[in-house]
């Protein structure tokens, strides 16, 4: 379905939990409060939303969190979404820690591909950033995803000045050894703006740093039709991608809505404009009526984000990564 600005909205990102087995500081601020179980949508409620979205042209679904693999019985949700007519891309974003335990079952259930969040290739720094995670588990997960052909495999890294910007050569070197797509993402000002100003690294600076050592050739979009701009590097097995939500936003081409774990339909990541889907579901709304609500929401999707608004507050764990 087209929104009011002629963008085709065919992609739903579904957060199934705000909980995570890691504690990355930019995702969860110190005062982060987890939701209680009753606040979270059940899998049947999530499936109701997906089914109601299908008549509007839904084609792509991504399961996120928190860390989605900490949600019990996630395979049930994956299997049921994969079985729906019209869904041609079902993806998962994970930190990779639990992925080896579930990878083969996820593949069998119908998962198309997987993205990994990884902000350091230094084991000690990885533990520091994540609050105790083990890098070797994530590297095992990446290898397993490639082995199972859950491709294209994408790795998402938030580059942070003073934290991991000095590892950029190591990240680029990785694509010479593995056929993965390593994407660098600008830090978004979701909670602590003062810290954000100190740590923010623009995509322009990232490209300048990499191109000083490597030849970057603008490449084609890699499966998923997301906002990344990709570059090929001669002799590399993979590619480099950059995502610039702030310095060069991609709102003109935005094709997605977000369903939070608590049942709020978020029309834009950076706006507090939401539709309380959970209350509608629990009041007995019919699927046809819910489709109508989704249609109206799509038509209210804003033209562009407002990361500069001083009243914007949020955390990625609550909103959904």
Curated annotation (Swiss-Prot):
Residues the record lists as binding S-adenosyl-L-methionine: 26, 66, 117, 188
The keyword Acetylation appears for this protein: no
InterPro entries cross-referenced by the UniProt entry: Aldolase_TIM (IPR013785), Elp3/MiaA/NifB-like_rSAM (IPR006638), MoaA (IPR013483), MoaA_NifB_PqqE_Fe-S-bd_CS (IPR000385), MoaA_twitch (IPR010505), MoCo_biosynth_MoaA/MoaC (IPR050105), rSAM (IPR007197)
GO aspect biological process, one term: Mo-molybdopterin cofactor biosynthetic process
Stored NCBIfam families: moaA, PRK00164.2-1
Start and end residues of each Radical SAM core domain: 4-220
Annotated HAMAP family: MoaA_B
Binding positions for GTP per the UniProt entry: 13, 62, 93, 154, 256-258
CDD domains from the UniProt entry: Radical_SAM, Twitch_MoaA
Enzyme class: lyase
SMART domains: Elp3 (SM00729)
Protein's recorded name: GTP 3',8-cyclase
Manner of cofactor binding, per the entry note: Binds 2 [4Fe-4S] clusters. Binds 1 [4Fe-4S] cluster coordinated with 3 cysteines and an exchangeable S-adenosyl-L-methionine and 1 [4Fe-4S] cluster coordinated with 3 cysteines and the GTP-derived substrate.
UniProt: [4Fe-4S] cluster 1 binding residues: 20, 24, 27
Protein family according to the UniProt entry: Belongs to the radical SAM superfamily. MoaA family.
GO molecular function terms listed in the Swiss-Prot or TrEMBL record: 4 iron, 4 sulfur cluster binding; cyclic pyranopterin monophosphate synthase activity; GTP 3',8'-cyclase activity; GTP binding; metal ion binding; S-adenosyl-L-methionine binding
Organismal lineage: Bacteria, Bacillati, Bacillota, Clostridia, Thermoanaerobacterales
PANTHER family in the cross-refs: MOLYBDENUM COFACTOR BIOSYNTHESIS PROTEIN 1, MOLYBDOPTERIN COFACTOR SYNTHESIS PROTEIN A
Superkingdom classification of source: Bacteria
Cofactor: [4Fe-4S] cluster
């Amino acid at each position: 379905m087209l929104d009011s600005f002629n963008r085709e909205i065919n992609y739903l990102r579904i957060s199934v939990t705000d909980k995570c087995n890691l504690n990355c500081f930019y995702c969860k601020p110190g005062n982060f409060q987890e939701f209680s179980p009753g606040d979270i949508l059940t899998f049947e409620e999530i499936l109701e939303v997906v089914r109601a979205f299908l008549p509007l042209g839904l084609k792509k679904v991504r399961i996120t969190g928190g860390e989605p693999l900490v949600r019990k019985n996630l395979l049930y949700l994956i299997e049921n979404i994969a079985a729906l007519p019209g869904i041609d891309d079902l993806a998962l974003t994970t930190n990779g820690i639990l992925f080896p335990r579930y990878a083969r079952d996820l593949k069998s259930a119908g998962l198309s591909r997987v993205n990994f969040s990884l902000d350091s290739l230094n084991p000690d720094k990885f533990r520091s950033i994540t609050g105790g995670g083990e890098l070797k588990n994530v590297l095992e997960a990446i290898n397993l995803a490639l082995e199972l052909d859950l491709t294209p495999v994408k790795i998402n890294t938030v580059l942070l000045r003073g934290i991991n910007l000095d590892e950029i050569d190591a990240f680029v070197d990785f694509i010479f050894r593995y056929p993965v797509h390593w994407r660098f993402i600008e830090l978004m000002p979701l909670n602590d703006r003062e810290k954000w100003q100190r740590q923010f690294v623009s995509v322009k600076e990232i490209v300048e740093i990499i191109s000083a050592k490597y030849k970057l050739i603008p490449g084609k979009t890699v499966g998923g039709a997301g906002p990344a701009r990709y570059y090929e590097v001669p002799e590399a097995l993979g590619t480099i991608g950059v995502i610039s939500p702030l310095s060069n936003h991609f709102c003109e081409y935005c094709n997605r809505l977000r369903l939070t774990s608590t049942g709020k339909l978020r029309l834009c990541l950076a706006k507090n404009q939401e539709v309380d889907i959970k209350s509608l579901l629990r009041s007995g709304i019919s699927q046809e009526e819910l489709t109508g609500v989704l249609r109206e929401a799509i038509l209210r999707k804003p033209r562009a984000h407002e990361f500069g608004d001083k009243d914007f507050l949020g955390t990625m764990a609550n909103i959904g990564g």
